[in-house]
């Protein structure tokens, strides 16, 4: 049987797609592929990607009308949070440690809450 093997892309609506893509490229080191498009390591990259569904009334994405949230797998959560703090990025003070990794949350310039995940080694 044919099956999906991962998430091929993440698509968000934005008031200014070029500026928002540039922000993600700058803050998270994601390669800019063109105006409004970013690529991680390329199609040969491996790693776990989660495709999850939350109840409509879940507060996990933060308050407000946000209907989706990106989870970015990061290599050094503390260092990245330091960089983001220095860049003036809005950061949620909450942290979560789980058996499968550490989590933190930030907001992009358009108010989307973004989850950062450093997998457990």
Task: Report each predicted region and the residues it spans.
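Vicinal oxygen chelate
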Residues: 1-12, 81-121
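Short, flexible turn/loop "capping" segments at secondary-structure junctions
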Residues: 2-4, 61-64
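Core segments of cupin and vicinal oxygen chelate
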Residues: 2-5, 11-50
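Short beta-strand micro-motifs in enzyme catalytic cores
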Residues: 37, 68, 102-104
């Amino acid at each position: 049987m044919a099956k999906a093997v991962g998430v091929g892309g993440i698509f968000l609506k934005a008031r200014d797609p070029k500026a928002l893509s540039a922000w993600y490229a700058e803050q998270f080191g994601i390669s800019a592929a063109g105006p409004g498009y970013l690529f991680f390591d390329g199609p040969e990259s491996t790693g776990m990607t989660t495709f999850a569904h939350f109840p409509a009334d879940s507060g996990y994405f933060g308050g407000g009308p946000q209907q989706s949230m990106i989870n970015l797998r990061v290599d050094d959560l503390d260092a990245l949070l330091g960089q983001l703090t220095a860049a003036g990025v809005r950061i949620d003070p909450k942290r979560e440690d789980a058996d499968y990794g550490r989590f933190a949350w930030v907001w992009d310039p358009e108010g989307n809450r973004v989850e950062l995940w450093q997998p457990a080694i």
